[in-house]
Amino acid sequence: GGLGGGCGRGFSGGGLPVATASAAPTGLGIASENRYEGTVGVCGNLPFLGTADVAGEFPTAGIGEIDYGCGNGAVGITREGGLGYGAGYGDGYGLGYGGYGGGYGLGYGGYGGCGCGCG
């Protein structure tokens, strides 16, 4: 075997520092001085977990409250990655008369990566 890690294998060595920053939420915004009661439904994949912001002053008499819920409470990434399939040089395998191809095609010997999204 060669040196180095392949697809699906852990790497050993120094740490890997990562810095990330989420994009600002877009697509859904409610801003008003009124009171909203009820349910706001959002379907689809959202690029953020959720935010709630209260700005301004609450009156000295009364209450202020934010109730926020998101699904069943299980927050996570549901799907990530590519297909893992690729088209490439067919190395002689392809459609042709008598089992002989023209040398190029989508076929058995094509290079398409390792199928895990890293190659």
UniProtKB/Swiss-Prot annotation:
Region described as Left arm: spans on this chain: 1-11
Q: Which GO terms describe its molecular function?
A: structural constituent of egg chorion
Q: What does this protein do?
A: This protein is one of many from the eggshell of the silk moth.
- Keywords for this entry? Repeat
Report residue spans for region: Right arm (Gly-rich tandem repeats): 81-119
Q: Where is the segment annotated Central domain?
A: 12-80
- Name of this chain's protein: Chorion class B protein M2807
Annotated GO CC locations? egg chorion
Per the record, the GO terms for biological process are:
chorion-containing eggshell formation
Write out the similarity annotation: Belongs to the chorion protein family.
Q: Which organism is it from?
A: Bombyx mori
